[in-house]
Amino acid sequence: MTTDEGAKNSGESPTATVAEQGEDITSKKDRGVLKIVKRVGNGEETPMIGDKVYVHYKGKLSNGKKFNSSHDRNEPFVFSLGKSQVIKAWDIGVATMKKGEICHLLCKPEYAYGSAGSVPKIPSNATLFFEIELLDFKGEDLLEDGGIIRRTKRKGEGYSNPNEGATVEIHLEGRCGERMFDCRDVAFTVGEGEDHDIPIGIDKALEKMQREEQCILYLGPRYGFGEAGKPKFGIEPNAELIYEVTLKSFEKAKESWEMDTKEKLEQAAIVKEKGTVYFKGGKYMRAVIQYGKIVSWLEMEYGLSEKESKASESFLLAAFLNLAMCYLKLREYTKAVECCDKALGLDSANEKGLYRRGEAQLLMNEFESAKGDFEKVLEVNPQNKAARLQISMCQKKAKEHNERDRRIYANMFKKFAEQDAKEEANKAMGKKTSEGVTNEKGTDSSAVEEEKAEGHV
């Protein structure tokens, strides 16, 4: 029997029914949030902390007066569970629901809007009634590109997160499909997980986790083991992976402001070498992390001695050039151009910077800009044969691009002309038909008039 049927049979309002029969779903068991299932949902899975949930709802005061409804707006309400984006009662109640479920919640003021209320619709210390339908839920898109989806099984402690270079101790379980291929405790440095056969998606996720947090990570190939796969674990190229990760402890690396210039320069030399090792191994995202550290440490460093300034500029120039090469490999051409711009800001005649920017712009179909960069390369080094070949490629690609555009526009104009001709033909046909009808009517009328005239004579 549904709650509505129960309410009708007993003559009680839904609010009274929940107050009498509702299940206390609070951790304190203080009857602050009572729940009755109106329609059973599908399966056994419920939303986790951080999941994006989609609901329809109706909200009423205890006297039955409606104060809000997503149905009136004809669109679902969306929020992230467990992130304090809604009242406490919702974070508690929606976490117990299954997809497709409809429930009634009765929420005491301390789990709703408290003594403040929410003027003008909700008075102070109001007990609220909600009917909620859980339409859908999905994990948190950590990087907003769909590559790492997190579902939090257990919320962490505090507000601090590991940073790049932090030492972490984690427990992990890795699965590909139904098969578990990895299960262990491991300590490593964030950004260097590859050295321990850990995919970069875990490094990225750890920077958003708190101590003792337990989560499930769904990694796309880009953040897993990529095109190379992982033969050691029997992972095929471009496989999607699932990891369950618990962050047991961590020690943050020094932030930039905690390091003096000498330490930054020393560390820059170390991470530059690490980045080069990753790059040569085809681990371009790992290399980006290392070269990026140099930029974060030195780009805004001021008050340096002449010797320090020269060393800093050398590290930054190398970092920007190497980042540009990494982004070219990762097919992130806009970022490659940005890094080349930074490098050329330090050395406007840098041959590598000009060439790599030209490469990126050629791949972005910016043929004239690319050609200009390759021509500048020849001004710096007339012996650069690769730049000459690239200029020819720019000219060829530009010609092909223009010819393709001409064909597209020619076909487009042809279709427009055919459509116009067809419309004109239809208009002409309509006019001719109209005139034919008029003439026919005119002839008939004339004949009648003639007959009448003859009759009168």
Swiss-Prot record:
One of its GO terms (biological process) is chaperone-mediated protein folding. SMART domains: TPR (SM00028). Coiled coil: none annotated. The modification N6-acetyllysine is found at K28, K155. The keyword Phosphoprotein applies. Residues 1-26, 421-457 are annotated as: Disordered. It catalyses: [protein]-peptidylproline (omega=180) = [protein]-peptidylproline (omega=0). This is Peptidyl-prolyl cis-trans isomerase FKBP5. The lineage of its organism: Eukaryota, Metazoa, Chordata, Craniata, Vertebrata. The gene is FKBP5.
